[in-house]
Design a protein with these regions (language model features):
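N-terminal leader/linker segments that initiate helical-solenoid repeat arrays
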Residues: 11-108
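Short coil turns that delineate tetratricopeptide repeat
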Residues: 51-52, 126-127, 162, 215-217, ...
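Short coil/linker segments at helix-helix boundaries
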Residues: 63-120, 124, 134, 141-187, ...
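Terminal, low-structured helical/coil segments at or just beyond the last alpha-helical repeat
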Residues: 194, 198-206, 211-219, 266-304
């Protein structure tokens, strides 16, 4: 019995603390990258000793997510893919341009393993906002032009935030307020708009409308929906409705002002353009933009 107790005590003494595991992990990652040789072995040992450790689960997520990725060059007919220009353009036998884009591809099994790790981390640490956004970021990269799961997760996150009012924790930030949360959501709106695919545009609109369902006077998301109608649907009447609503709330909103000028030009509505150009002159922070708006106003005045 004495030998068994001594052996157990020795084993406990030899098991590194969670902090020590994390220090070893960070050192390896700094030298070898997130999926370097030996990192999986260390993570497995860490998991065996501390199966619910948040840093360990984050490490496993990072390892499998990194491991799942590979770079490829694919041919696409469009001039841009996911908002990026081609890395190479050649011509086919008929002389038509063929664009080649560099993309990240994913191994489904390894990606699935990364998701299991981050989901367990979220389950054990429901108020860690960084973990939730890491999951969405991974899904966004994985799904590319069709971000259905990313959209679903973002909508659920918004609803959870607005109905449960969690006390979010985000490493590196002393306090997580509504402004930070909204700014993080807007980053995904920007990304989906940049992707410029039918599915990503709809995701952009749906996220914006979900935010507006809780904050109907939020000019950031009103501008978003206006841009959807302007750029995606070319429904200028609907777009103007949203931009005018923004300007009633915030008369110096540059996004709404500039897009109303663009809308006026697209519809050859000189009267409307002359209405909004002075606002650009008044509120723009850019000297060149103000000068350009003044010159345009003068040119329109000469034409009448």
């Amino acid at each position: 019995m004495a030998v068994s107790v001594l052996a157990a005590a020795t084993a406990v003494a030899q098991t590194p603390s969670s902090k020590e595991f994390n220090e070893r992990y960070q050192l390896l990652v700094s030298k070898l990258g997130p999926s370097g040789v030996g990192i999986e072995t260390l993570l497995d040992k860490w998991e065996a000793a501390y199966p619910d450790d948040a840093d360990m689960l984050l490490g496993k997520f990072t390892y499998y997510f990194s491991k799942s990725q590979s770079s490829a060059v694919v041919a696409k007919p469009q001039e841009k893919f996911l908002g990026e220009k081609p890395v190479l353009t050649l011509k086919d036998t008929l002389g038509n341009p063929v664009n080649y884009f560099q993309v990240t591809e994913y191994d489904d099994e390894l990606f699935g393993m990364s998701q299991k790790s981050i989901e367990k981390a979220i389950q054990l640490n429901p108020d860690r906002l960084d973990l939730r956004f890491l999951k969405v970021a991974a899904l966004t990269g994985y799904e590319k032009e069709s971000p259905d799961m990313a959209l679903s997760n973002l909508k659920s996150l918004i609803i959870y935030n607005e109905t449960q009012h969690p006390k979010w924790v985000y490493p590196g930030y002393e306090k997580v307020d509504e402004e930070l949360f909204s700014a993080a959501i807007q980053e995904y709106c920007f990304l989906f708009f940049k992707y410029a695919t039918p599915v990503s545009y709809e995701a952009f609109k749906e996220i914006s409308e979900t935010m507006l369902s809780y904050h109907p006077s939020d000019v950031l998301y009103l501008d978003n929906v206006g841009s959807y109608w302007l750029v995606v649907k070319h429904d200028y009447k609907q777009a103007a409705k949203y931009y005018n609503k923004v300007l009633k709330i915030k008369q110096d909103d540059i996004t709404a002002i500039k897009n109303m000028i663009l809308l006026a030009r697209n519809t050859s509505n000189t009267k409307l353009e002359k209405k909004y150009l002075p606002l650009l002159v008044k509120y723009s922070d850019s000297e060149s933009e103000r000068l350009s708006a003044k010159a345009r106003l003068e040119a329109l005045s000469i034409k009448k």
